[in-house]
């Protein structure tokens, strides 16, 4: 079926999952805010019709839209049933895949979407899955003219588009960026659903697969422009932010590097070096995180250790992860700030013979990262995909957010929906 003849513009798959319910609510909010003429037909998909209806009813109550359940399609679909995945994909132009961990459940969705000419956006933060999908399916997706766009939530839209925003705001050539993520919490603290915890456990437990995948990829190194960016110590002090920091172990570095490769090889852009960190406050927080990290890295090496980590997330994460996830109050009181420190060269400066002579600082700020900012980012990526098709890379394929949306108005959309990009300072040295 041609995509213009399909009954739904987008389908939220995994709508009754912990993150999926918030994505569903965000799609509903977007559609309610739209003018009648611009509203898009959409659906939710999952294994249980009853649970899907409950999610819609909850969103209807929260948004004051009693008729929501009757306005949204419902598709029964099971990740273990390829025929049901095909049937779902045939009914949509775009699937928003919220079913993780993606290393176990992501590939069947990608495969079904490509085979049925349907594009797909996910919120995966697992580098091994993201890079594997590019290696296996980029050419197949391009042949079908569909777009598979990964990591379109908090992992890794703020980082990926934040680097592009910093590049676009610099009056010269940006050559290197360091980002520092700061999570701001209220009195009740931070809590993350254990789905993210499980993805981290499986990812660290199988690091060898990612190394092997990269070793056989035979990709040419991306050239380093200007002074090589020095990596910080595992624990370092950031004077600008008055805080200790540690390396950020999510998907941001993998995603940003893939974006920079794509932009360099396909659009001849000057590549940007990148490093990512997370601030942890004072020395007490550093000690606490060091103990948590040592426990995690020891247990994750062994099968029985991984089982214990999965069974007792609250204990081994020192209370940061739980099977219940955050309360509404915790989410309301939490926000994030991602600060980017960039360096580069003014126009006309010889890069090979000089040190960087421009500094720039930008920020991306937003609400709670996992279940407020992630749905906003995913839904605005979807709206951008559906409305700015002429600005996407030609021909389809498997893309990072930065590669897919570098020429679109996604940053403008995010700014209007509470994920704000801004320049803090810019100066010549």
UniProtKB/Swiss-Prot annotation:
<feature type="modified residue" description="N-acetylalanine">
    <location>
        <position position="2"/>
    </location>
</feature>
<dbReference type="InterPro" id="IPR051276">
    <property type="entry name" value="Saccharopine_DH-like_oxidrdct"/>
</dbReference>
<feature type="modified residue" description="Phosphoserine">
    <location>
        <position position="215"/>
    </location>
</feature>
<dbReference type="InterPro" id="IPR036291">
    <property type="entry name" value="NAD(P)-bd_dom_sf"/>
</dbReference>
<keyword id="KW-0597">Phosphoprotein</keyword>
<dbReference type="GO" id="GO:0005811">
    <property type="term" value="C:lipid droplet"/>
</dbReference>
<feature type="modified residue" description="Phosphoserine">
    <location>
        <position position="209"/>
    </location>
</feature>
<comment type="similarity">
    <text>Belongs to the saccharopine dehydrogenase family.</text>
</comment>
<feature type="modified residue" description="Phosphoserine">
    <location>
        <position position="217"/>
    </location>
</feature>
<dbReference type="Pfam" id="PF03435">
    <property type="entry name" value="Sacchrp_dh_NADP"/>
</dbReference>
<dbReference type="GO" id="GO:0016491">
    <property type="term" value="F:oxidoreductase activity"/>
</dbReference>
<dbReference type="InterPro" id="IPR005097">
    <property type="entry name" value="Sacchrp_dh_NADP-bd"/>
</dbReference>
<dbReference type="GO" id="GO:0005739">
    <property type="term" value="C:mitochondrion"/>
</dbReference>
<keyword id="KW-0007">Acetylation</keyword>
<dbReference type="GO" id="GO:0030496">
    <property type="term" value="C:midbody"/>
</dbReference>
<protein>
    <recommendedName>
        <fullName>Saccharopine dehydrogenase-like oxidoreductase</fullName>
        <ecNumber>1.-.-.-</ecNumber>
    </recommendedName>
</protein>
<keyword id="KW-0560">Oxidoreductase</keyword>
